[in-house]
Curated annotation (Swiss-Prot):
Record EC number: 1.5.1.5, 3.5.4.9
Organism: Prochlorococcus marinus (strain NATL2A)
Protein name as catalogued: Bifunctional protein FolD
HAMAP family reported for this sequence: THF_DHG_CYH (MF_01576)
Lineage: Bacteria, Bacillati, Cyanobacteriota, Cyanophyceae, Synechococcales
CDD domains xrefs: NAD_bind_m-THF_DH_Cyclohyd (cd01080)
Keyword presence, S-adenosyl-L-methionine: no
UniProt subunit comment: Homodimer.
């Protein structure tokens, strides 16, 4: 039987560590960590994700400075809001919820966030720190994947890793983190020819392509470890329609095809998703400890 990499359980364990770090530092810090999540417009998926993050803040005692901004906000207006949060001493982390409306310059806005308050690890300076192996905020989803692998004692060093997807949000930083852990890494993408022949060579396969059910039985080798980063809502099939069931969650991987073949896999939901939110909290608490002159007791949680 394959090992199921339970991100929900691990996220709860790490949240407890973060909560304890906050409580032990309050006497010196005189304030709780602060996280500002900026949501622009009314994208339903973004609303769900922001709600998850606010609930997570409540659970561990992080103060939320969330802002829900109008769809047609200008680049200048949003930049000014970010600048004011950069100056706000009670805010330790800033996250710009992506995707943004098409009229906004994502790169310019990410650059406007203080790198020291970059809770999502996407500022160019922090991506550069990742390349150089220097400490700093880390991209949340790849950091969550690394934690999931480490806590389940899955060896990375010397392994052949294939990352499907090359986004700045997941694919590229994921490849860098695996390389730093001494894996031999290949990145596949939408222009890769004969994807199955490449992915079958992987000891560790991380799929972040954003395409439901892209990877199936013919893409994986025996005893491979598969990490499914994707999450999608599929319309109910005919059987579910009769039962009036809602849409169905799935990932980029056909788990039902591969589960008897692989050594371990992350489920959807309950795998990478909870870890992404927890690493956002870890980045924020780490920044809070730094800003308040506290011992950096949780930095080991970040790759």
């Amino acid at each position: 039987m394959p090992k199921i990499l339970d991100g929900k359980k691990l996220a709860q364990e790490i949240e407890l560590i973060l909560q304890q770090a906050i409580e032990s530092g309050l006497e010196v810090a005189k304030r709780r960590p602060g996280l500002a999540v900026l949501r622009v417009g009314d994208d339903p998926a973004s609303g769900v994700y922001v709600n998850y993050k606010e609930k997570a803040c409540d659970r561990i005692g992080v103060r939320s400075f969330a802002k829900h901004l109008k769809e047609d906000i200008s680049l200048e207006e949003l930049t000014e809001i970010i600048k004011s949060l950069n100056e706000e001493k009670n805010v330790d982390g800033i996250l710009l919820q992506l995707p943004l409306p098409s009229h906004l310059d994502e790169t310019a806005l990410l650059r406007s966030i203080d790198p020291d308050k970059d809770a999502d690890g996407l500022h160019p300076l922090n991506l550069g720190r990742l390349i150089k192996g220097e400490k700093g905020p880390r991209s949340c989803t790849p950091a969550g994947v690394m934690s999931l692998l480490e806590r389940n004692q899955i060896k990375i060093e010397g392994k052949r890793a294939v990352v499907v997807g090359r986004s700045i949000l997941v694919g590229k930083p994921m490849a860098l983190m695996l390389e730093a852990a001494n894996a031999t890494v290949t990145i596949a993408h939408s222009k890769t020819k004969d994807l199955p022949s490449l992915t079958k060579e992987a000891d560790l396969l991380v799929v972040a392509a954003g395409k439901p059910y892209l990877i199936g039985e013919n893409h994986v080798s025996e005893n491979c470890v598969v990490i499914d980063v994707g999450i999608h809502r599929l319309p109910p099939d005919e059987e579910n329609m009769k039962e009036l069931k809602k849409t169905k969650l799935c990932g980029d991987v056909k788990i039902f095809e591969i589960e008897d073949k692989v050594a371990a896999y992350s489920p959807v939901p309950g795998g990478v998703g909870p870890m992404t939110v927890t690493m956002l909290l870890a980045n924020t608490v780490d920044r809070w400890q730094k800003h308040c002159g506290l011992p950096l007791t949780i930095s080991h949680l970040l790759p």
